Amino acid sequence: MATVVMEQIGRLFINAQQLRQIPRFLESAFPKLPCTVMVSDVPWVFRESHIITGYRPPDQNWRYYFLTLFQRHNESVNVWTHLLASLIILVKFQELSETVDFLRDPHAQPMFILLLAAFTYLGCSALAHLLSAKSEISHYTFYFLDYVGVAVYQYGSALAHFYYVVEEEWHAQVRTFFLPASAFLAWLSCTGCCYGKYASPKLPKFVHKLFQVVPSGLAYCLDISPVLHRIYRCYSSEHWCADQAVVYHCYQVLFFLISAYFFSYPHPERWFPGRCDFIGQGHQIFHVFLVLCTLVQIEAVRLDYTERRRLYEHLHGDLAHDAVALFIFTACCSALTAFYVRKRVKTYLEEKQE
C-alpha cells in the first residue's frame, strides 16, 4: 500500500514539474513581442484621431503581426469582434445547412449569398485590422480588401431584403431597377472608400469621411427600403403586428443606425483623448453594433425564408440564378477597382521614396 501511495506521489511530482515547464514552453512558442509605441513613432497613415498609444511598430516580419492577435494593442478589440463574429457566421451556416438545401433549392441561394457576404466582410475586416500595420502599402492593400468585403455585404444584404423581405406592393415599384442599382451602389461604395483612402493625404479629414459615408448611405437607403416598407405595413395595420421577423428587422435597423453614428463620429475618444486607446473607441463600438445588426438580420431572413415561401416563389420565379451572377459580377468589379487603386498607391509611394 505504501509503495502505491509513493508511486502516486511521484507521478504528481512529475506532473507538477511538467506544469512548471508550461510557461517556458509557451514563451518559446510565442516569443516576446515588441512593445507597442506612441502615435509619434508611426507614420502619418497609421495614426487615428485622438488615439495616442497602443500602435504596433511597422516594418516587422509577418509572423509578428499574426502573433499580435494575442497582444494588447489599439486594434485588438477591432480584430476580435469581427473574427469571433465570422466564426459565429460559420456556426450559423452549419446549423442552417441541416434544414436548408443550399445546393438544390434555388430559393435558398440568396440566403447563402447573405451568409457568404457576411463572412467575407467580417473576415476581410479582421485581416485589415490585424495586418495593416506592417507597412504603408500593406495598410492600403488590406483596407482596400476590407472595402471590397463591405461592397459584397451591401449587395448580399440588398439581395436578401429584396428576395425574402419585400412586400408585393413595394416589389411592384422597384423590381425593374432594385438589384442593378444595388450592385452599382455597392461598387460605388467600394470605389468611394478606396479613392478616399488613396487621396486622404491631400484631403481634409471630413472630405475623406464623405467619400466613405455618402455612397454607403445611398446604398443603405435603397437596400433597406424593403425592410422599412415591411415594418411600416406591419405596424400601420389595424391589427397589432405579430410578425416575429419584423421585430428582428426593427432591431437590425436600430443597430445599424447606432453603428453608423459611431463610424461617422470619433466618440468617445474625442472627449477623452488617450483614455480610449485600448478599449472604448468609437470604431470598436461601431464593430459591436454592426455585428449585432448582421446577426439579427440573418435571423430575420431565416424566419422570412421559412414562413414566406409562397410569396417569394410567386414574386421572383427563377430570379435567383441571375441574382447570384450579379453578385459575382459586383464582387469582381469591386476587386478590380481595389486592385487598380492599389496600383496607383504603390506608384505614389515609390515616387515619394525617390
From Swiss-Prot:
Topological domain (Extracellular) residues are 98-110, 163-175, 266-277, 340-354
Q: Which UniProt keyword terms apply here?
A: Cell membrane, Developmental protein, Differentiation, Lipid-binding, Membrane, Oogenesis, Receptor, Steroid-binding, Transmembrane, Transmembrane helix
Q: Does the keyword Thylakoid apply?
A: no
Task: Decide whether keyword Membrane is in the record.
Answer: yes
Question: Mostly located where?
Answer: membrane
Q: Which GO terms describe its cellular component?
A: plasma membrane
Cytoplasmic side: which ranges?
Answer: 1-76, 132-141, 197-244, 299-318
The membrane topology term of the UniProt record is: Multi-pass membrane protein
Subcellular localization, as worded in the UniProt entry: Cell membrane
Query: Which biological process terms from the Gene Ontology are attached to this UniProt entry?
Result: adenylate cyclase-inhibiting G protein-coupled receptor signaling pathway; oocyte maturation; positive regulation of MAPK cascade; response to steroid hormone; signal transduction; steroid hormone receptor signaling pathway
One Gene Ontology term of the molecular function aspect: steroid binding
One Pfam family per UniProt: HlyIII
Show the stretches that span the lipid bilayer.
Answer: 77-97, 111-131, 142-162, 176-196, 245-265, 278-298, 319-339
- Record-linked InterPro entries: AdipoR/HlyIII-related
Q: Which family does it belong to?
A: Belongs to the ADIPOR family.
Q: What does this protein do?
A: Steroid membrane receptor. Signals upon progestin binding, resulting in rapid activation of MAPK and down-regulation of adenylyl cyclase activity. Interacts with steroids with varying degrees of affinity, showing specificity for activation by the maturation-inducing steroid (MIS) 4-pregnen-17,20beta-diol-3-one (17,20beta-DHP). Capable of mediating progestin-induced oocyte maturation.
Write down what this protein is called: Membrane progestin receptor alpha-B
